[in-house]
């Protein structure tokens, strides 16, 4: 029964993206517009041996570009990117369903997932945006944290969950860092709960496991760019440039006010 639900959700996600993700959908062969076209251009360039951030520049994280590159490696066209989108959204929908099942029965949970994904149509734009990939890395911590709170509220937060939160946060950070803020909120609530309960040791271990999770994802990425000789370029584009961009935007708003 669970397998049937997962297959249905996967097919629904494929149909949704085929209609809504105009930049990558096989139904829109010649469509090219928006941020997605930039991401695919850089992804295609990577698949042809070019270096992101030095040969081509954009201020998104490397995971986004290498997912696009993987799509072009797979098929040589944007169809590969569409396939990767389908995988990510399908997995996201499954974790949405698993989360909903904590509170509702099967049919109601499926409806919740469908409504949520349909609501995503208002922000998907032309598809293949950073949020689309980060949703999976956000849904995993949401599911795990809610599962723990509802199933085992009186037990310490599992350390392996905190490690997973760290990995997911790093994944979001290396796509678009502000997309991972929600995960930071989950960790913060967990730590506040530990301090209120006077479980200082638990709080320390939770922080440690979260940091280890971040390092588990961040270190291989940084080593990869270090070997390529473009680590400083990647850090500047992914983090420094965006902090500068956000700071300048805030300054302009304040001066305008």
Tell me the role of every PLM-derived stretch:
Residues 1-23, 101, 159-162, 205-212:
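Start-transfer (signal-anchor) and selected internal transmembrane alpha helices
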Residues 62, 66, 74-94:
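Loop-to-helix entry region of an early transmembrane alpha helix in multi-pass inner-membrane enzymes
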Residues 83-103, 140-144:
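Transmembrane-helix motifs of polytopic, lipid-linked glycan transferases
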Residues 96-118, 135-136, 153-160:
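Transmembrane-helix signature of polytopic, membrane-embedded enzymes
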Residues 124-134, 229:
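Short acidic/glycine- and proline-prone juxtamembrane loop motifs at membrane-interface regions
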Residues 141-164, 196-198:
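Membrane-interface transmembrane helices that cradle and orient dolichyl/undecaprenyl
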Residues 160-177, 183-190, 216, 221:
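Membrane-interface alpha helices of multi-pass inner-membrane proteins
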Residues 182-215, 223-227:
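Perimembrane helix-loop-helix junctions
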């Amino acid at each position: 029964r669970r397998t049937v639900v997962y297959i249905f959700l996967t097919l629904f996600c494929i149909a949704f993206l085929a209609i809504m993700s105009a930049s990558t959908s096989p139904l829109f062969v010649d469509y090219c517009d928006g941020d997605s076209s930039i991401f695919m251009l850089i992804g295609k360039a990577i698949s042809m041996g070019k270096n992101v951030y030095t040969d081509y520049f954009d201020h998104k994280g490397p995971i986004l570009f290498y997912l696009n590159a993987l799509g072009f490696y797979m098929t040589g066209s944007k169809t590969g990117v569409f396939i990767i989108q389908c995988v990510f959204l399908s997995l996201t929908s499954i974790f949405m369903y698993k989360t909903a099942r904590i509170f509702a029965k099967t049919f109601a949970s499926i409806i919740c997932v469908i409504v949520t994904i349909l609501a995503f149509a208002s922000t998907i734009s032309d598809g293949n945006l950073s949020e689309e990939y980060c949703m999976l890395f956000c849904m995993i911590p949401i599911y795990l944290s809610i599962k723990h709170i509802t199933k085992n509220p009186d037990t310490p937060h599992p350390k392996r969950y905190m490690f997973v939160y760290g990995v997911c946060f790093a994944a979001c950070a290396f796509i678009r860092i502000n997309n991972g803020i929600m995960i930071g909120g989950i960790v913060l609530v967990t730590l506040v709960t530990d301090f209120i309960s006077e479980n200082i040791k638990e709080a320390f271990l939770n922080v440690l496991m979260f940091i280890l999770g971040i390092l588990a994802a961040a270190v291989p990425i940084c080593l990869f760019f270090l070997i390529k000789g473009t680590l400083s370029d990647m850090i500047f584009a992914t983090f420094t440039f965006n902090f500068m961009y956000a700071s300048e935007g805030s300054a302009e708003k304040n001066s305008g006010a």
